[in-house]
Amino acid sequence: MAQKALEQTTVKEEKLELPTTIRGLAQLLDIPLVDCLLPCNFCGRFLDYLEVCEFDYKKLTLIWKDYSVYACCRLCCSATATYEFNVFYQQTVLGRDIELATGLSIFEIDIRCHTCLSFLDIIEKLDSCGRGLPFHKVRNAWKGVCRQCKHFYNDW
């Protein structure tokens, strides 16, 4: 019985040690970031170097399946964001009303871009609040528009 508990603890510890970022994986393997070849979890295509950098910049998390690692390419990030918005949309608030809806300060709210899934920094969040742009609640998480995707909406 004690041995079984020890084995379960060991398995849990092993899973906790798996890196969640590509940079962390590269450091663990002691290889340059440019040499990391990761398949996309959705389409199977390998991420190019720019997508590898974007993945970590967006603060996305690696997906581990039986000790095989997967990431998400740029196109699949956009497709996933669109799918989640269309299927799991809950509500929309404008500008500073997000603080009333959540009961939190804009500084404390985690917001991702609803187009590319990048985390919005404080400047992007304050800009959206100041302009009265919409924030959408999708799958119990808040979505806005990042500075790069704003250009697609001609809002710069």
UniProtKB/Swiss-Prot annotation:
Gene3D superfamilies for the chain: E6 early regulatory protein
MF annotations from Gene Ontology: DNA binding; zinc ion binding
Keyword list, A-Z: Activator, DNA-binding, Early protein, Host cytoplasm, Host nucleus, Host-virus interaction, Inhibition of host innate immune response by virus, Metal-binding, Modulation of host cell apoptosis by virus, Transcription, Transcription regulation, Viral immunoevasion, Zinc, Zinc-finger
Domain of life: Viruses
GO CC annotations on file: host cell cytoplasm; host cell nucleus
Protein's cellular compartments: Host cytoplasm; Host nucleus
Zinc finger (unnamed) residue numbers: 40-76, 113-149
InterPro entries: E6, E6_sf
Main location: host cell
GO biological process assignments: DNA-templated transcription; regulation of DNA-templated transcription; symbiont-mediated perturbation of host apoptosis; symbiont-mediated perturbation of host ubiquitin-like protein modification; symbiont-mediated suppression of host innate immune response; symbiont-mediated suppression of host type I interferon-mediated signaling pathway
Functional note: Plays a major role in the induction and maintenance of cellular transformation. E6 associates with host UBE3A/E6-AP ubiquitin-protein ligase and modulates its activity. Protects host keratinocytes from apoptosis by mediating the degradation of host BAK1. May also inhibit host immune response.
Family: Belongs to the papillomaviridae E6 protein family.
Assembly and interaction partners: Forms homodimers. Interacts with ubiquitin-protein ligase UBE3A/E6-AP; this interaction stimulates UBE3A ubiquitin activity. Interacts with host BAK1.
Protein name: Protein E6
Protein source organism: Human papillomavirus 47
